[in-house]
Design a protein with these regions (language model features):
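Noncatalytic, helix-rich "gating/capping" subdomain that lines the substrate-entry/channel surface
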Residues: 1-212, 261, 266, 278
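Zinc-dependent metallohydrolase catalytic domains
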Residues: 2-25, 29, 206-343, 351-522
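Walker B catalytic acidic pair
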Residues: 348
């Protein structure tokens, strides 16, 4: 570094340092655009920015009924994925060439659109130009500072020195744990999958998922409120949806660090960071669905967590191993239990068509599935019916007054209702193939409903119910975008016709809903 004399040499060194796992002012962001993986540099020092951060997945459903805001958001997202001007940004050209990434896969915001938020296009542009104009001596000083930050991973004496200066106090163990939480996800997931996700198990679970896909196709075909053109769009989307189940279909060696020869934690740090960077470079330009599971693991967390979710800009569902193992899936129990638990999978599939998911097309770009405004308005009307219905539920166990927030939870409630129908219809088809008829068929249907209730069984205090519903900033409890467990059961089954027949529910019963008021969306 001391031998640097030109900016070009400095930029080239930055790329080399990134490849070797050292700290620099930059991180490499990978994101989905136009059905493939694009990349861009995001700054570490206050310039964090990725195209998808402008609309958080967990909040974007709230834009569904705000067309004016959506009209502004669309050009913003378009701006974030425009290829950059090579002549204007020679620093980026040099860094990406050193990383071995094709410039065809590189993006940078190059305009100031109408909507500016934190981590904005304008801020990122200014930061990039500022760094590009930084002198060699200033770069040396900055790079030295970044490299010295890694001293905390070398030994306890180095950590003590760093803590005594400008950094927050950490123990050596805490520093290592923080690092592991961020950089060990791919290796940890690889080892976990080898132990718990067999090829046979993955094939079996994929078979269940394909049953749900086929059921969704049938429900689209039988839908009574959508036009044929919108049905075609929805069918194309469910056909194209990627099911990431258990573990990636393939693992990339670039992302797996060999730690067997490393002597210090710092050696591990550099090796793992280097592997992470090499994997991101490998993913650049790849089809977004093929890359999706790898990106999620390195960016969001390892397969050891209990998680299942859908991400619109991949048009992909992700099912982690916990949902394939006991007690969630258990081959030793009645099929009703396992199919009822598949509701969680159906829930994630339906997220691709909820108040947020319906805005994404089959390749994961922002283009909703509605072929006509009449379909769009009917979907909004039915979603509003669900909002109104869920808003009638009292969430406190032994008192009235606090109602469920149907608007805040609408996307999850749409997914719950759709997920139930996908799992239940699939189970009934399975039973009929097995030869169940009459009273035995009825009994198995009842068991499905009971298993669904068991899936959502839980126990908590009235205070927790209140905090989850309203949020409690003082206690660090965020408002939950999901309805509480009891409401997730009652809100769904009361909108299904079979519940009334199977459990002899009468018009005089508390949760009776007249047939014409039962809500159907998907």
């Amino acid at each position: 570094m001391n031998a640097l004399t030109t900016k070009e040499e400095t930029w080239k060194l930055i790329g080399q340092l990134m490849k070797e796992g050292y700290s620099t002012p930059f991180e490499l962001a990978v994101f989905s655009v136009g059905g493939k993986m694009g990349v861009m540099l995001q700054g570490r020092a206050g310039y964090d920015y990725t195209p998808n951060s402008l609309i958080k997945e967990s909040l974007s459903w709230q834009l569904a009924n705000k067309p004016d805001l959506m009209a502004k958001i669309r050009p913003l997202r378009g701006a974030t994925t425009r290829g950059f001007d090579i002549e204007k940004y020679p620093m980026l050209v040099t860094v990406f060439q050193e990383l071995g990434i094709s410039l065809d896969d590189v993006y940078l915001p190059d305009m100031n659109p109408d909507v500016i938020e934190a981590g904005s296009v304008e801020q990122n542009m200014q930061a990039t130009l500022m760094m590009q104009n930084t002198s060699v001596e200033e770069w040396k000083e900055a790079l030295t500072e970044f490299l010295l930050q890694d001293a905390i991973y070398f030994d306890e004496e180095a950590l003590e020195y760093v803590n005594s200066s400008e950094y927050s106090s950490l123990t050596y163990r805490q520093a290592a744990e923080n690092f592991a939480e961020r950089y060990l996800n791919y290796e940890k997931s690889y080892e976990f999958a080898k132990a718990y996700v067999s090829a046979d198990q993955k094939q079996l679970m994929t078979g269940y998922a394909e049953e749900l896909r086929q059921t969704f196709r049938e429900r689209i075909r039988n839908n009574v409120w959508m036009s044929d053109a919108s049905k075609q769009n929805a069918t194309e989307k469910i056909n194209a949806m990627k099911f990431n189940i258990g573990a990636p279909d393939e693992w990339f060696e670039e992302g797996l660090a060999d730690l067997s020869q490393e002597q210090t934690v710092l050696d591990d740090v550099l090796a793992l960071r280097s592997a992470r960077m090499n994997l991101k470079c490998r993913l650049a330009g790849m089809a977004n669905q093929r890359a999706s599971f790898h990106v999620i693991i390195i960016e969001e967390g390892s397969l050891t967590t209990v998680n299942a979710f859908y991400i619109g800009n991949y048009n992909a569902m992700f099912i982690y191993p916990a949902f394939m193992l006991p007690p969630t899936y258990n081959p030793e129990v009645n099929d009703a239990h396992n199919y009822a638990n598949m509701m969680a999978w159906g829930h994630e599939i339906t997220h691709g068509f909820d108040t947020d998911g319906a805005r994404w097309n089959k390749i994961g770009d922002l283009e909703d599935i509605w072929a006509s405004d009449a379909d769009r308005q009917e979907f909004k009307k039915r979603s509003q019916q669900l909002i109104d219905y869920y808003s009638t539920f009292d969430v406190m166990p032994f008192e009235t007054g606090l109602k469920n927030d149907g608007a805040y939870t609408v996307a999850e409630n749409v997914a719950d209702l759709g997920g139930f129908f996908l799992a239940y219809d699939s189970y009934v088809k399975h039973l009929k193939k097995q030869g169940f008829t009459g009273d035995q068929l009825r009994l198995q249907k009842q068991r499905f409903y009971e298993a669904y209730g068991y899936f959502w069984s839980g126990k908590w205090t009235a205070e927790n119910a209140k905090n989850k519903t309203l949020g409690n900033e003082a206690k660090g409890v965020a408002k939950d975008e999901h309805s509480l467990f009891r409401e997730r059961v009652n809100g769904v089954v009361t909108n299904t016709d079979d519940w009334y027949d199977l459990f002899d529910v009468k018009p005089t019963d508390k949760f009776y809903v007249a047939p014409e008021k039962r809500i159907r969306i998907w």
